Amino acid sequence: MAAKEIIFSDVARTKLTEGVNILANAVKVTLGPKGRNVVLERSFGAPVVTKDGVSVAKEIELADKLQNIGAQLVKEVASRTSDAAGDGTTTATVLAQAIVREGQKYVAAGLNPLDLKRGIDKAVAAAVDALKTISKPTTTSKEIAQVATISANGEESIGQRIAEAIDRVGKEGVITVEDGKSLADELDVVEGLQFDRGYLSPYFINNPDKQIAEIENPYILLHDKKISNIRDLLPVLEQVAKSGRPLLIIAEDVEGEALATLVVNNIRGILKTVAVKAPGFGDRRKALLEDIAILTGGQVVAEETGLALEKATLAELGQAKRIEVGKENTTVIDGAGDAKNIEARVKQIRVQIDEATSDYDREKLQERVAKLAGGVAVIKVGGATEIEVKEKKDRVDDALHATRAAVEEGIVPGGGVALIRVRQAIRELKGANADQDAGIKIVLRALEEPLRQIVTNAGEEASVVVAKVAEGSGNFGYNAQTGEYGDLVESGVLDPTKVTRTALQNAASVAGLLLTTDATVFEAPKDAAPATAPGGPGAGGPGFDF
């Protein structure tokens, strides 16, 4: 085990605070509509230009071990806030720095750090309650666009794209962000349920222009095993042929004689069919087949459900208004499933989301909810260069997360004003002793910091603006984009309540831990390697001229 060094009390806290300040100073230049970019070096490829706080924080590793520990603690604030709310990482970093800075003064003056932390926690709890009181739900597409625009650093086109995507797929729908292939941003919306499996034979194609198979008003057979023997399929094929409607077969695989017979019948016009593989693998495949069955009003023909393929009837088949099958994707549009059954299935999957332990499982379950409840929208981010697309894509991701947070917990006035307003609820607070009162004062001062930084980044005098905003009430605040005072909600400067709440709670949590630290243990630096390698001068080896 490597040797460790231990640093105590003020020396440790001073070094940790230096690390906090180095990271926070790099991150906070990005805050607000007039915040600046930060350029990040990459070990390979082009550098990255970003205005995303957590991206900047993640890149920072300091040479000094003690300073680096402080920086990593604040990095944790940004990461936690990003994970929980998807935005607000810079605000969280600024708040953490302010709490640490103010707290250090009191600790140096001899106040009890644990009582300071208790006072901080008490003030933050009161601030969170006050935030919930002034929060209002997002009800209109315009408000959603405004939240997204603010999070995307004032770019209205991004806000409009996200609002349009939510309009199209609903609040439950999946919205993904991809690199585009043109200069402009594009929005693609997939209606209905889509899964990533295409036709098993190109002979199923009946729309050569689009290179897809389209079938109207089809029956849908769902089977969890391979189909290779046509005799197993014949009974259900005969029933579908009599009905005069087409058939989509979704199974683990369709091969050999069965696939050949389907292709021949399709070409001759005897029975219009399309066969595709079932999506997913293992248990996930079973779950996805069940989702499709509920959406289309059918049943999965499987041993587990007591149904045999050779005994399947039209009653077990699902139905839909239209099916589109491409080379790689199948889309089921307007399935005939019962709305109550679909709703029950969505609730069931939501319970699984709450219980999921891995991000991957949670993401896949959320995709299933979206496919059942809404749809899928893809925002393709355009730009002239790869660097521009990457930077813009980060902002679209932030805006998307902020929008979801706003839908979840509502909105408050932006521009740091909500944090100024909740100070009123903290002023009346009293701690159990004078040290706890000092902890409450730390939070009172720290709550000004996001507004101060926004104003500083806009090139104005922070103290003057903070004083004027504090004199006002409600939504009155400073719009850094226009340089004017007014009603921020009316002018569209909004923040999601969840983002503001999460930023404050995480900042106070980590800053409080840092203030109560009295010893730091870290790995001792290794001794420098000898300057002369073996076999060099004086080692007794032969001499060489180079």
Curated annotation (Swiss-Prot):
Q: What is this protein called?
A: Chaperonin GroEL 2
Q: Where in the cell is it found?
A: Cytoplasm
Family matches, as HAMAP family: CH60
Organism annotation: Burkholderia ambifaria (strain ATCC BAA-244 / DSM 16087 / CCUG 44356 / LMG 19182 / AMMD) (Burkholderia cepacia (strain AMMD))
The record describes the protein's role as: Together with its co-chaperonin GroES, plays an essential role in assisting protein folding. The GroEL-GroES system forms a nano-cage that allows encapsulation of the non-native substrate proteins and provides a physical environment optimized to promote and accelerate protein folding.
- Cross-referenced Pfam families: Cpn60_TCP1 (PF00118)
List the PROSITE patterns hit by this protein, alphabetically. CHAPERONINS_CPN60
A GO CC term attached to the entry:
cytoplasm
Give the residue ranges for region: Disordered.
527-546
Q: Where is the composition biased (Gly residues)?
A: 535-546
**Enzyme Commission code(s) on record:** 5.6.1.7
Q: Which reaction does it catalyse?
A: ATP + H2O + a folded polypeptide = ADP + phosphate + an unfolded polypeptide
